[in-house]
């Protein structure tokens, strides 16, 4: 855990992304962008699921707390605003450190920061006389209601000369375009996530033998992920022995591993919001049968063809088509 009052990482890339988004908004006519993080979810009674921030929100903010919203104003003068939870000594005793607006503004590089309770009051002021509203509607009914409430609050002041934005742009679509090209910090994080996951798969392979259970191998993966510093699995791990591997999203992971079967593992860690994803299949006993080896080699050849077709200038589908061609011919050859 980072010491209270210090940012969790270098926030320079996040500030640069906000500045780049503001430039794109200005080029499209200006306006205001509003982006909330993910809500907390109750697991049972007073227990919550482990919190995970919204990816789009984190991409711009580096801020991991729930109950937070980023507002970006792309006018003649740009403005970057963060709304977050207020400092609360009692809740921090229960739940841990909270940044609070003042410390968060300085640490994460925002021009202004306010408590999340101020959002409803201040949002109409940011929206007034702006040409465009950049947000994403249709994903969360509660959030949609807050946005519509703010727009209606501006409309209610029409007699004073204020006007609301005349149209809404999909903010996620704009951010998707930005996220297609990774910056240096993203690439470094993704490579480290891949290294952690590759080492976890090797650990799982070494631990596999007939008589063990799928969940025991899953535990090896989870141990390796967390011990290397990742925050969580990127998705529920698939550890599927024998026929279970034919279920595309098998997650029970509770069956015994048998001699002669293959074990499929589809698992990867998440590191600083970035996912890794690795799938490997290998013999439970450590040695392929003849038929298993033939099919394994065919899949490996298809993967090599796909990798070879992954290069600048090719279409998105080129790697897939290269793999399909190898698989189709290989299956014919195998009879």
Regions found by a protein language model. Name each.
Residues 1-335:
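Active-site neighborhoods and metal-handling regions in enzymes and metal-associated proteins
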């Amino acid at each position: 855990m980072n010491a209270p009052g210090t940012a969790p990482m270098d926030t320079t890339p996040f500030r640069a992304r906000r500045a780049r988004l503001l430039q794109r908004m200005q080029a499209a006519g200006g306006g205001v962008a509003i982006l909330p993080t993910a809500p907390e979810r109750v697991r049972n009674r007073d227990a919550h699921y482990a919190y995970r921030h919204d990816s789009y929100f984190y991409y711009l903010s580096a801020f991991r707390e729930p109950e937070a919203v980023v507002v970006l104003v792309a006018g003649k003068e740009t403005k970057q605003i963060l709304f977050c939870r207020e400092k609360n000594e009692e809740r921090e005793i229960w739940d841990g450190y909270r940044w609070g607006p003042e410390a968060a503004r300085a640490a994460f590089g925002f021009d202004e920061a306010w408590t999340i309770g101020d959002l409803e009051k201040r949002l109409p002021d940011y929206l007034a006389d702006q040409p465009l509203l950049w947000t994403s509607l249709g994903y969360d009914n509660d959030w949609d209601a807050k946005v519509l409430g703010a727009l209606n609050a501006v409309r209610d002041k029409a007699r004073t000369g204020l006007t609301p934005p005349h149209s809404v742009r999909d903010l996620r679509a704009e951010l998707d375009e930005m996220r297609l090209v990774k910056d240096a910090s993203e690439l470094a994080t993704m490579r480290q996530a891949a290294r952690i996951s590759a080492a976890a798969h090797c650990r799982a392979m070494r631990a596999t033998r007939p008589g063990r259970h799928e969940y025991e191998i899953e535990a090896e993966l989870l141990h390796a992920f967390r011990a290397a510093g990742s925050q969580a699995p990127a998705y529920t791990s698939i550890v599927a022995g024998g026929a279970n591997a034919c279920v595309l999203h098998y997650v029970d992971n509770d069956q015994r591993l048998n001699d002669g079967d293959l074990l499929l593992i589809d698992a990867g860690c998440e590191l600083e919001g970035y996912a890794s994803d690795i799938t490997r299949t290998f013999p439970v006993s450590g040695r392929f049968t003849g038929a298993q080896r033939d099919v394994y080699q065919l899949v490996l050849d298809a993967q090599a063809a796909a990798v070879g077709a992954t290069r600048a200038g090719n279409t998105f589908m080129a790697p897939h088509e290269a793999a399909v061609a190898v698989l189709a011919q290989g299956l014919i050859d195998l009879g």
